[in-house]
Amino acid sequence: MSTMMKTSILLLVAVMLGSSDAQNYSKKVWDLVATYNGCYNNSERLSENFTKHFAVNVIVKPVLALAMGPGPQMYIEVSELRTRVELRQFIILSDGGENVVKVKPYHFTGWDKYGPGQFDTDKFATYTKDDFWTDPSWECELEAIANGIFFGGWPVTTHKGVNGTRLTWGCIFLCDQASVTIPAGGDEVRDVVPYYYKRTCPKFPLINPPADYVSPCDQKLCPCGKS
């Protein structure tokens, strides 16, 4: 059996086994997966002469590594100038307090071996728990402040600040846009003006959402700046 066929079968099994657990997660968790989803870049803002900003590309997509449980999972990749990966994480989401989603990032086998856009997320179907690792300082929370709008800090897990502390990007996620504020002390270009991104590709399909789930990005009342 070829590796591609084996991976396809494992993905199908993962979807079948995970579907019954979709109801165990609140709508706000699924809303985050649906909201922060797709390919993004800041090319529009760069065209407005924001010379202190790098050209940044972001990929965020739902994934499923059955070894890590059946719940909502995400893959995020942030790259600069299409040459250097600034951030690459496997994410497990869970319910926090009221209107809060807990975010637990992991690194994984091969996370630092691929260039921008080169990692095949189907590989997660073949990974075991031993292929993933995390640190308590990487965990964060995002708050659903409105329908289709999330706010919070996102941990930079690839490096620490100049004083050895964990860096956190300040983030706002909308259905088709995102903004990121870069903290002082990192090796990124620091600017008081946040990085603004717009989605440039169709959203990726959700994996095992509840049968009656409706994304806030599909609702006419979503105040999320659809473009």
Please give the residue ranges for each predicted region.
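N-terminal secretory signal peptides that target proteins for export/translocation
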Residues: 1-3
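Calycin-type beta-barrel ligand-binding domains and close structural analogs
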Residues: 6, 23-55, 63-66, 73-227
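Cleavable N-terminal signal peptides of Sec/SRP-targeted secreted and luminal proteins
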Residues: 5-22
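Conserved ATP-binding subdomain of kinase catalytic cores across diverse folds
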Residues: 59
